């Protein structure tokens, strides 16, 4: 899969809770940090769904709007809305050029949605995307496995992002965490 710089999004289902975290850095090109406090994790569908993006900010806003429309159309059915978004995203000539990836979740489902048509639900209840995604994913899996009985979903999400921010130059430590 394509890597998008300037962000890290991490999401986890753990002990009956769902949490998603994202950093606040927006990078212009490969050299200039333009913003430190962007909000890349949002609540959708009356606060029942969390969505986070990696990639172009303008493209992400387009995808958030489209995804929220699909959630409304399918009455909050997250898997169906994600599949329909992925189908439309992949088949439309203009949308196909959008450079972003989404993680979407509710209390039961956690999904990665990409413009190549993938809708992936992880086996372990953890997903991460963006330039620091691999670092956050490794940290989150370790935290869940070795300290999961002592940490909440929200604490794991925040710690995974903090670790990624210490490694990835495109990820900062201005972290937003949302929980369901």
From Swiss-Prot:
GO terms for molecular function: metal ion binding; threonine-type endopeptidase activity. Belongs to the peptidase T1B family. HslV subfamily. Na(+) binds at residues 165, 168, 171. It comes from Geobacillus sp. (strain WCH70). It catalyses: ATP-dependent cleavage of peptide bonds with broad specificity. GO terms for biological process: proteolysis involved in protein catabolic process. Protease subunit of a proteasome-like degradation complex believed to be a general protein degrading machinery. The active site is at 7. This is ATP-dependent protease subunit HslV. It comes from the Bacteria. A double ring-shaped homohexamer of HslV is capped on each side by a ring-shaped HslU homohexamer. The assembly of the HslU/HslV complex is dependent on binding of ATP. The keyword Metal-binding applies. SUPFAM superfamilies: N-terminal nucleophile aminohydrolases (Ntn hydrolases). It is found in: Cytoplasm. The keyword Oxidoreductase does not apply. The gene is hslV. Its EC number is 3.4.25.2. GO terms for cellular component: HslUV protease complex; proteasome core complex. It is an enzyme of class 3 (hydrolase). Allosterically activated by HslU binding.
